[in-house]
Regions:
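Catalytic glycan-binding domains that act on GlcNAc-containing polysaccharides
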Residues: 23-195
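N-terminal secretory targeting signals
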Residues: 1-43, 183, 187-220
Length: 220
């Protein structure tokens, strides 16, 4: 394998680790960095990603098996970047290459509008033009930046709340699909808030130090 390819794989492995590694109740740093650039609440971007591709540690271990001895298994459920959804069925893979190879086969059998890819499950039919290639669609940071861009656009269309923007992210036409999706995102947000409050109490013992996740009203 060429030296450049090895370097690329190493950098990508570091990126995935950044997106998975955090305290049990923290939002991983990678999501915070991307969200800040786009003016999206980090908790919203993370909750959307959880809704799209969440995997429990045991499920991640099952996918990875013994393919990467250096991979650090997260202690809690995290979004998984090597995910494809085809016609409503999800597929998880151990590496970017495996996911990309599977996608090439799916694209010969299904229209792009029936395929979602990556850590934030961006639909290739509606938003594939936002990627330079199908390979790029599996880069976790490119996927998250794309998702944050779409969320920002949805927020402008739905200025009442970020929850409505999340529903738009899943189903721009609204209706029952958006409502169901929003309910799942809300559950993730509420859990994140509870966990953050619990952590603050354990570390500080001060209710005044509780983090305030602003995901219903606009963030000033």
């Amino acid at each position: 394998m060429a030296r450049g390819s090895l370097l690329t794989m190493a950098l990508l492995s570091m990126a995935v680790s950044t997106l998975c590694r955090a305290g049990a109740h923290d939002i991983p740093e990678g999501y915070v960095r991307v969200a800040t650039v786009h003016g999206v609440p980090a908790e919203v971007l993370y909750a959307v990603s959880l809704t799209e591709t969440v995997m429990a540690p045991s499920a991640i271990a099952g996918v990875m098996k013994k393919r990467d001895a250096d991979f650090r298994l997260p202690s809690v459920a995290r979004p998984w970047p090597w995910t494809i959804n085809v016609a409503g069925k999800g597929y998880r893979y151990a590496s970017r290459l495996e996911a990309w190879q599977a996608l090439q086969v799916f694209l010969t059998r299904y229209p792009a509008r029936r395929i979602d890819v990556g850590i934030a499950q961006v639909n290739l039919g509606w938003n594939g033009h936002r990627f330079s290639s199908t390979w790029a669609a599996f880069d976790p940071y490119i996927s998250l930046n794309t998702a944050a861009t779409i969320l920002s656009e949805c927020r402008r269309r739905h200025p009442v709340s970020w929850l409505q923007a999340a529903g738009c992210y899943h189903h721009p036409a609204g209706g029952a699909p958006a409502v169901r999706y929003t309910a799942v995102v809300r559950q993730h947000l509420e859990r994140l808030h509870r966990d953050a409050v619990k952590t603050a109490e354990q570390h500080d013992g001060l209710t005044a130090m509780h983090p305030r996740y602003i995901w219903t009203e606009p963030r000033e």
